[in-house]
Amino acid sequence: VKASRKEATAWHLSGTPEPDGYVNLVTMMLRVPEVKACAKEHGVTVTELLCAAMMQAIDHLQAEKVPARSRRKPVKVTVPVNLRGLFPSHTLRNFASYVNTEIDPRLGSYTFDEICQLVHHTMGLGNDAKTMRAKIATNVASEKSPVLRVMPLFVKNIAMKAAFNAVGECKACLCLSNLGVVQVPEVMRPYIERFDFVIGPQANAPHNCGVATWGDTVYVSCVRNIKEPELELRFYRVLHSLGLHVTVESNAR
């Protein structure tokens, strides 16, 4: 059975583009024990906690930008899922899919606990072998199209990139990818100060977010290709409101 790709388009923050392609990076450093305790308090995983915090930040920002509730769009964050835990694979290539977590501001205001529960249950439903198998079947069916099979590769590359930019990334506000706890051989540890997981901004949205944990610190790397740090500021406020101590650094020029 194939899964449908039809989804509502998410709200996208806009701003002043950096003139020379400069990418702004804001890294927020959190204490692992505090983050784990906070996630446990809300009954979610660390990834789900950070996803819910980001969604609340986006929701607050959209409410400021779009006062009329009826005109607001869904707030959606894409969370990559490692398929190796669902399907046996020895490939060294990227073997992942995604789950789009969502709230609809037109339905009313959401508390943080409500967002946490929506994210938690969406991840539980989406991160399932049967659901992922249906998504994979959709992609495989496209590959078997007679038209696509005879199409020159350079045409496929152009068409796929255009389709991804038009109907792929636009379905979510941003991607929040958690690399998890970084593991290295013990002999390497004395020479490593920290790990940062930085992913580039999207084609049709100015933000993205990567997370990695090293030692007792969670590093949340927020990138943007616009000048205004509005989302990062609201994300920081949400984390601070949860009682988390946040240290912030930036490459702002």
Predicted regions located by residue number:
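Flexible, P/S/T/G-rich "lid" or insertion loops adjacent to the active sites of thioester-utilizing
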Residues: 1-44
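Acyl-thioester-dependent acyl-group transfer interface
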Residues: 25-30, 36, 60-253
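Short amphipathic alpha-helical segments
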Residues: 46-55
